[in-house]
């Protein structure tokens, strides 16, 4: 039995970088994880935090899925109280 490795990436914004840089770093890290044989890649949703760029997991999941081939990508959490449940379900079904 082999161990399946996963990553939970909160898209941190390093000092001196922009949120755009952080999101590009997230996609790059996902590619590297896939190349190293990781099984899953999780992203998180955060709002109003200058040190974290992941405010739209459904958009970020689409970017990561488009940049990788075998990596299973998902959201480690969605702030459901901010959205209509049907809209969340529809957004993730499209992915």
What are these regions, as identified by a protein language model?
Residues 1-73:
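N-terminal beta1-alpha1-beta2 module of alpha/beta enzyme domains
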Residues 41-45, 86, 95:
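Generic signature of intrinsically disordered, low-complexity segments enriched in small/polar residues
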Residues 74-82:
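The substrate-binding groove and active-site-proximal loops of carbohydrate-active enzymes
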Residues 21-25, 81-94:
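Glycine-rich anion/phosphate-binding loops
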